[in-house]
């Protein structure tokens, strides 16, 4: 145990008085943190403080709830890094959907028989596809979980007794059902609740995210509001630009915005909005720019992101991906892969594939070992024996040197055998999300299908595994998937009506898409390019009637708008 008065932040990091006060706060608190404010680090340090000072002593735990799987995974990894494996075992990180599903799956039996779901029920996205028996939406699942905890006071008491501290990340994206669920369990309890978010980055408004969630939380939980403005991510000029855009779109009351604007001077080489004639020329020019960043500016490919509002059938990513490949630059489309890799099964599989394709990789081995030991509790002799069996299996399944010519079918067989031999019986027991539905099969085959495709673009299995892991590859994803990530350079592709205002514009829709754009802008550290094309094969002639409202604001505050003719070479 460390005394709270002498506790210091981990990793040699220093925090200002406000951030340190948030870390050490032992009452309900809401934190409004702008882009680049380091909220993941602050939450990780707060978890360390709570665990190391024994404010949350064994057998109590910390519950962390996120909206996205990768966010839940990121905060768990950061806490493990900051306070070590043993203490971080008591930091339980879930998505809100996974947490509510775990309650439904484990305690559904407390309901009347006619209210219980069928075995193997399926989660659907559209309420029209649900029947509340064997098919239901995530909102219906949350409503059912809320009914269960209301129906069973003992269960509610158990949850409260298990989790003394609660973190809720991306709080602005919780909808009414999810907020009511959290409120029902933890409001007026002994649990201490911390919520973190940024209303400017509320990208789940289309899913009925609460517009006044922070106000409700402060009122219901008697919480204090703290605001962190500091942006540690972006360059000074980009930070100024982002701040100005945020103030223009969501002005504070009783503040003369125009009088307080410090206009950013943005270099056109690093911050521009390009208009191309068609998507082919767009892809060629932007690929050359990415190649220039890699070769001349020494930016690693994985530090470059190409973002889109939507990417159905890879319409937006395919052209630029092909052009990059012609230049010898690999890219990976993470829109689906990102979810798979954030799963425990995804981490097991990617660690295994890494060890299949390299003589040794310490990080991959430690990840695989820790996940295996997490599944099995046994004595040290049994552990050593089982781990030696895993190592023997890996050594006999090489996909480099003499094994470099093995086929995908060989790799699939080895992967299936490994999972059956070492993880199968425990997988859905330890991680309940695999008990029902298709998530286990989707994750396993989703990753291997991506690997098969990556092998067609690579000269070896090692390169293919690197590619799907995002090593040495430009990353392509939707803006929603980029939430919480940061990159040295960002290209926002397809700023046109079809992507953002296909069904027209209302004030609500404009506010929603401003938040989406704001998330994209704030992913960049030092370079930000925005692109549109007058023609695309899948949409035809592009229109800018509605999106011009956003474009005009971007140029007003410093983004350079440039027309790039088809005849132009690397004008950009």
Task: Please describe what each predicted stretch is.
Residues 1-108, 522:
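P-loop NTPase Walker
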Residues 5, 11, 48, 181-267:
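Conserved RecA-like helicase ATPase core segment
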Residues 93, 129-165, 175-181, 460-463, ...:
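Conserved helicase/translocase P-loop NTPase motor core
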Residues 93-102, 196, 452-505, 512-535:
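Conserved helicase core region in the C-terminal RecA-like lobe
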Residues 223-224, 231-327:
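Helicase P-loop NTPase motor core
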Residues 298-425, 432:
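ATPase/helicase motor core of nucleic-acid motors
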Residues 376-481, 502, 558:
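Accessory C-terminal helicase-associated subdomains
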Residues 388-406, 496-572:
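C-terminal accessory regions
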